[in-house]
Amino acid sequence: MTRYIFVTGGVVSSLGKGIASASLAAILEARGLKVTILKLDPYINVDPGTMSPFQHGEVFVTEDGAETDLDLGHYERFIRTTMTKRNNFTTGRVYETVLRKERRGDYLGGTVQVIPHITDEIKRRIVEGAGDADVALVEIGGTVGDIESLPFLEATRQLKVEVGSRRALFMHLTLVPYIATAGEVKTKPTQHSVKEMRSIGLQPDILVCRSEHSIDQSSRRKIALFTNVEERAVIALEDAKSIYSIPMMLHAQGLDEIIVERFGLECGPADLSEWQSVVDNEANPEHEVTIAMVGKYMELLDAYKSLIEALKHAGIRNKTKVNIRYIDSEQVYQQGVDLLKGVDAILVPGGFGERGVEGKIQTVRYARENKIPYLGICLGLQVAVIEYARHVAGMEDAHSTEFNPKSAHPVVGLITEWQDASGKTEQRDEASDLGGTMRLGAQECKLVDGSTVRECYGKAIIEERHRHRYEVNGNLVPRLEEAGLQVAGWSQDGSLVEVVEVKDHPWFVACQFHPEFKSTPRDGHPLFEGFVRAALENAGGK
């Protein structure tokens, strides 16, 4: 039977519920338990797929093609369980399901209400998402007290009553601020946050107190007294230099032992040696490189969360400190490529829309002509193809139909038909809805022998995740190949270009998929590791 840990947040948002949940899950997994994590988002969007990165940050794509919250990326980086569409749902998704049932007449003419209909659907999805896991952590987005979160909190209250206190508990994250003028931490916001929880029928069993300073024993005792929480269950979580050290920090305070005792679980001690190795390698690099990341969402780096972490993982695996220089592609267009001078490698990530595209094309040209290692991802492949077509293959007005529908050389165009991973044909056109209409999720890719990417992966067939609506125009591929561009990877049916390389270049790889979604701190990712090695070689040759 699955046990449930409901994770809530108080005082302020962005406390790190996702990291705390993932870290706790990592400890429980290290004790031999089967663990999964769900994220419940209170916003009314059906999914984050059409939301601006400035609003929401990164959209994390699962193996089965769901566009989900970036917290699912944290979950996959911390535990071995692969997330699916069942691990993330929103208020919008819940209401959509309930309204569809109402239209079908499933409620037999009854009045459809938040309680019980919405809360029942939330509970159904939680139980379904938990599956056969020993422990399911359920993170509820937002802050306790928000109107949007109330149906989710009510549903979890009901679920705890239904399964019993031996199978469910509440873990509440709060902020314990440090007041510099007084020279002490203040517990009052935490007391009020718990008071807010109790007003809606929820009593936290564990408090995780976030603070930039250490929380002394007397403050923890005071918090325990005023919140009706056992003193040893008041966990202090200071700001950490590395998020990958948090499993050790929580384990040192016995958080996993509290949970195992409460649930009556039989399992071994936690083996956190892999995490200790990750932290040690991150803290003691032997080399250093600087990589330029040229994109359009540089004001909010959460838009590139998985990518930043993937570079960090590759650095850990190569015992290399990776410094990332974040450069807005519009600035490259306005100020020139001098902004790129002094870097050891260049990465152009994915993105949507025309803004900043010409700056990315200039960036690609700079990397190609100056023999600087280049990795292009998604749009980073498309701009690489456009640049090569314009400046090497003689197609001066080459462009993507996304940005210039009238181009005489549309080297990138809308995919109207493709096969999904199961071999089923999917079709789209310009009139298709924006939400959920892309080529999404894990797809097989066949790598060409002798290519750089084939050497990185060490195998001929790989599986990577996609999120795109445009693709290299197959009709113009022969002209590009004649001009020296190498197609190094094809889709499973051989119809779509997945990877391109430039032959007379030390390391120039551009892929249509998103390898960052499969990178983890313990296992890294072969493509990013190869990229960082190329950056190291370039740095050593200067």
Curated annotation (Swiss-Prot):
GO terms for cellular component: cytosol. Residues 290-541 form the Glutamine amidotransferase type-1 domain. CTP binds at S13, D146, I147, E148, K186, T187, K188, P189, T190, Q191, K222. InterPro entries: Class_I_gatase-like, CTP_synthase, CTP_synthase_N, GATASE, GATase1_CTP_Synthase, P-loop_NTPase. PROSITE patterns: GATASE_TYPE_1 (PS51273). SUPFAM superfamilies: Class I glutamine amidotransferase-like, P-loop containing nucleoside triphosphate hydrolases. One of its GO terms (molecular function) is identical protein binding. The active site is at C378, H514, E516. Residues 1-265 are annotated as: Amidoligase domain. Mg(2+) binds at D71, E139. ATP binds at S14, L15, G16, K17, G18, I19, D71. It is an enzyme of class 6 (ligase). GO terms for biological process: 'de novo' CTP biosynthetic process; pyrimidine nucleobase biosynthetic process. Homotetramer. PANTHER family: CTP SYNTHASE, CTP SYNTHASE-RELATED. Catalyzes the ATP-dependent amination of UTP to CTP with either L-glutamine or ammonia as the source of nitrogen. Regulates intracellular CTP levels through interactions with the four ribonucleotide triphosphates. Belongs to the CTP synthase family. CTPSs have evolved a hybrid strategy for distinguishing between UTP and CTP. The overlapping regions of the product feedback inhibitory and substrate sites recognize a common feature in both compounds, the triphosphate moiety. To differentiate isosteric substrate and product pyrimidine rings, an additional pocket far from the expected kinase/ligase catalytic site, specifically recognizes the cytosine and ribose portions of the product inhibitor. This is CTP synthase. It comes from Hahella chejuensis (strain KCTC 2396).
